[in-house]
Structure formats: C-alpha cells, structure tokens
C-alpha cells in the first residue's frame, strides 16, 4: 500500500514467492518459499526489508557443497534476513544485509554490504562484499568471502552495457 498522508513513508511491500526446481525427468529437486512480511520505502528513497526464506533440497548421493559431501536425502531449512538500502538517486548509496539461519540443516550466517557510486548520470560503479559462514555438523567450518565489482553505462532507459567481475576465496579465482 501507498501512504499519501505521510511524508516519511511512501509505501510498504508485503510479498510471497514460491519456486519449484525439477530435473529433466520432471522430478522435484528443491523448492524455495520467500516470505517478506515487511518492506518499507521511506520518503528519502531509503528502504528496509525483513524476509524469511524456506528451502528444501533433495541432493543425489555424493553431491558436494563447497567440498563438503552431503548424504542423500531431503534437507529443509530456514533463513531470515534484514537489509537496508539507501536511495539510488544519491551520488553515493550503500546497502547492508545480515542473514541468519541454516544451510543443509547446519547453522549459517551471512553478512554483506555494498557501495555504489554514480560518477555521472550515465555511469554507475559499485562493489559488494559478503562473508558467509556455515558451521557444518560433520565437517570443518566453511567461510566464503566474495567481492564483486560492477560497472554500468546507460545509453537510454532501454539500452545499457554492464560488466561484472567477482572473486571468491573458495575457488581463489576471478571470474
């Protein structure tokens, strides 16, 4: 809904999304449900969002996640996140996010942040950094650090060129 009677609050967003993933034989592999009970967009253009995500996965025997072998079976877990994003209309905008929950039924957390610079009207440069930690029950802790850089040139609202570069400590490579 929109809030025309207030200057400080423009709109609130309440969403639900559901995704199904199947293999080529149309067998269910995993599902994802996203609940966003609260998203607020303020008069300044800044926004804050809380959401919960429910995951299920049925990995085949021997599948590995970041080098950790998973037992065949059905996995189910929840994640909860709180995020803030400053208005993209500013020359400099920031984003922050924290997420807690599980991954493959092991405790997990994620912290991230980003910075975007609007160098001039047609050129945007930004980078994001995140740290994800999983405390596996049967393996050493995984700590994944990812840094991403992105540059975008806008020629018109319908035409732009964007380039992304990313590094993560798991693969120890740039891609």
Question: What role is predicted for each listed range?
Answer:
Residues 1-175:
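Exposed, low-structure sequence patches enriched in small/polar residues
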């Amino acid at each position: 809904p929109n809030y025309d009677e207030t200057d400080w609050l423009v709109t609130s967003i309440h969403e639900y999304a559901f995704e199904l993933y199947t293999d080529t034989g149309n067998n269910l592999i995993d599902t994802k449900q996203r609940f966003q009970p609260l998203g607020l967009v303020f008069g300044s253009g800044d926004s804050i969002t809380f959401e919960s995500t429910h995951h299920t996965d049925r990995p085949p025997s021997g599948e590995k996640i970041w080098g950790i072998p998973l037992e065949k079976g059905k996995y189910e877990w929840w994640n909860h996140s709180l995020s803030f994003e400053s208005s993209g209309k500013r020359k400099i905008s920031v984003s922050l996010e924290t997420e807690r929950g599980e991954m493959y039924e092991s405790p997990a957390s994620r912290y991230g942040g980003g910075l975007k610079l609007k160098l001039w009207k047609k050129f945007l440069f930004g980078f994001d950094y995140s740290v994800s930690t999983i405390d596996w029950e049967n393996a050493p802790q995984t700590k994944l650090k990812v840094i991403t850089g992105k540059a975008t040139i806008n020629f018109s609202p319908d035409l732009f060129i964007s380039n992304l570069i990313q590094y993560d400590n798991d693969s120890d490579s740039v891609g």
